[in-house]
A protein has these predicted regions:
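Membrane-interface segments at the starts/ends of alpha-helical transmembrane spans
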Residues: 33-35, 115-117, 224-243
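Alpha-helical transmembrane segments of multi-pass integral membrane proteins
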Residues: 237-253, 286-310
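Alpha-helical transmembrane segments in multi-pass membrane proteins
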Residues: 20-55, 245-247, 310-311
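Functionally important transmembrane alpha-helices
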Residues: 173-232, 240
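Membrane-helix interface linkers and caps
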Residues: 2, 41-84, 99-105, 252-275
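Juxtamembrane helix-loop-helix connectors linking adjacent transmembrane helices
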Residues: 30-31, 35-38, 63-133, 303-311
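Interfacial transmembrane-helix boundary/kink motif in multi-pass membrane proteins
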Residues: 2-18, 62-91, 235-241, 269-295
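Function-critical hydrophobic alpha-helical transmembrane segments in multi-pass membrane proteins
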Residues: 49, 110-174
Length: 311
């Protein structure tokens, strides 16, 4: 029987829907006025604060829900390596979607700020790498993952990853976050520490910020060979997808080998009892209504994005 003081699936789903609406309304507004301060408000007030308030009101244990357990230095370093090696994998899946979309029209570059100088670089590392890494992990690998674990660990990891991808509300950046969510979710379970997800998330976003900064530097040195002003066409995207896919295959093997070290170091974690999972199967579909509504919103946003590309 579910403990009323413990976070549950329905509560997490409702909070997910509310946060998604806040992201698309208040988040969009504050980021439109000023990207950097808007991102800070979005991450700390719209994404981090709601789950903290929910757990507090629910009366659950913060350390239990968010897995605020120590992470070995060795595992932290391995996670950094795993994330860097997994970056091409996430990029590959995003490129696959971008390639298909490019057949509809000219795709637009993602609305992510890039650093043009070293001071902007450090500011974006704090905002995009550190802040997003902390706040989003508390929400997804913290609250969402813990709430869904009554359905079994595999289901919890998969569902939280899907919701993580959905939460970006960008068809071009959907599969990448899903893949990363699977990796971060598994690492959090193996280590029983949210810090595993935070380190991984911060590393991934840090790589993205660094690559954007380097591209701007290259453009400045080689103004006649601009490599970022225009988005590539379908043929170029196909070539890029094949190339990145080849790189991802190699780095993926490396990431797996590093992951094996963590698996050997951590105790084998048990899955939920079969009878408990069976009870969840009888759960009312009403519990997942907030997710369905969020999915409808996502589809509408994607429709607007595709319509903009085709026109």
């Amino acid at each position: 029987m579910e403990n009323r003081k413990e976070v549950g699936i329905l509560g997490a789903n409702i909070l997910y829907l509310i946060t998604a609406i806040l992201l698309l309304t208040i988040g969009y507004y504050v980021q439109h006025k000023d990207v950097e301060s808007g991102l800070i408000i979005t991450e700390y007030i719209l994404i981090l604060l709601p789950p903290l308030i929910y757990v507090r009101l629910k009366g659950d244990n913060f350390k239990r829900v968010f897995r605020l357990n120590k992470l070995k230095l060795k595992h932290g370093l391995l996670i950094i390596g795993i994330t860097i090696l997994s970056y091409p994998i996430a990029l590959f899946f995003n490129l696959v979607i971008m390639t298909f979309i490019s057949t509809l029209g000219n795709i637009e570059p993602p609305p992510i700020p890039t650093a043009k100088n070293i001071s902007e670089y450090f500011v974006l590392m704090i905002i995009i790498s550190m802040s997003a890494g902390i706040c989003e992990e508390f929400f997804f690998r913290g609250l969402i993952l813990r709430s869904y674990e009554r359905m079994g660990q595999i289901n919890a990891i998969v569902i939280s990853s899907f919701l993580f991808g959905l939460f970006h509300f960008n068809i071009q950046n959907f599969l990448g976050p899903v893949i990363l969510g699977l990796i971060f979710g598994y690492l959090v379970y193996r280590t029983d520490s949210l810090f595993a997800g935070i380190i991984g998330h911060m590393t991934n976003n840090g790589v993205a910020v660094t690559l954007g900064f380097l591209i701007n530097l290259i453009n400045r040195k080689l103004p006649k060979q601009d490599i970022s002003t225009n988005m590539p066409n379908t043929l170029q995207l196909i070539m890029a997808t094949v190339f990145v896919g080849f790189i991802a295959t190699i780095t993926g093997v490396g990431a797996y080998l590093l992951l094996r070290i963590i698996i050997k170091d951590t105790k084998k974690r048990r899955y939920m009892e079969v009878e408990n999972i069976e009870k969840i199967k009888k759960m009312s579909l009403f519990v997942f209504t907030p997710i369905l509504l969020t999915g409808i919103i996502f589809i509408y946003v994607v429709y607007l994005q595709l319509n903009s590309i085709m026109h």
